[in-house]
Amino acid sequence: MVENEVDLPNGGAGAIEYLDMLAKLGVGNAHPGGFGETLEQLRKYPIEKGSRVLEVGCGTGRTACYMAEQGIQVTAIDIRPEMIAKAKVRAEKTNVQVEFVVGDACQMPFEENTFDVIMVESVTNFAIAEKAMSEYYRVLKPGGKLFDREVIRIKEMTSDIHKALCSFYGVAQLFSMKEWQEMLESCKFSRVEFSGAHPFPRTMFEDQVQHPDPVHLSDKQSFLDPEIWKVSAQYDQLVNKYHRYLGYTLMMAVKE
């Protein structure tokens, strides 16, 4: 049966509204799998102390500050100044040193061959993906590694469903694992690997319970803003309706 019911509840939400919601609430684990997946990745693929790491799309800085606590030299970039401001507050509260930079993943203010590792958590989808991947390659040192956790399309969908999902999230396209691999290879990455094709989580509640964020960075009165809860409700309803089309994976690749 082909599913064509794609109207978003209460009239729909756009990219700015969804990303604004995350910014205003100061969400530190919005990526698929949450902070638990971040911890698991760092256990499974440890980064050596002293490595120079770039986190792209750092948000409120939870991952960046955690890595800094482990003795890693971290630079973190985000396109939204309000996110960088909150990330700096987190770094101060957790007493760690992170270089935070406001900037675009598609045009990063770093020299070639600068970083040993690039960490990305559900950011490339929101950028011009191939352009961002080319930038990751440019600023990595030879032998440097890319770790990028992104949403993937795991089941073919109608164009209307694809359009509705892309419109809500503010992305141009939802890529399959094969399409991500082709993109990485076209950007000159080698040794491309994927860790799983996990079901898309229908809620962040479990991760928030298991890994509560000790630093609260929500805007004042944000929890009383009806527009935020409108977008939150739209997110829940959209994910509940179409989650079977989506998954997520950790992509790993090397600049040789």
Residue ranges with predicted function:
Residues C106-V117:
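A short acidic, Gly/Pro-enriched loop at the edge of an enzyme's catalytic core
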Residues V117-A129:
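A short SAM/SAH-binding and catalytic strip from SAM-dependent methyltransferases
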Residues L54-V56, T60-Q107:
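Class I SAM-dependent methyltransferase SAM/SAH-binding core
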Residues A172-K188:
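Short alpha-helix
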Residues V2-E48, R62:
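Conserved class I S-adenosyl-L-methionine
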Residues L25, V151-V171:
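Short, glycine-/aromatic-enriched active-site segment of Class I SAM-dependent methyltransferases
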Residues S195-E256:
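Conserved Class I S-adenosyl-L-methionine
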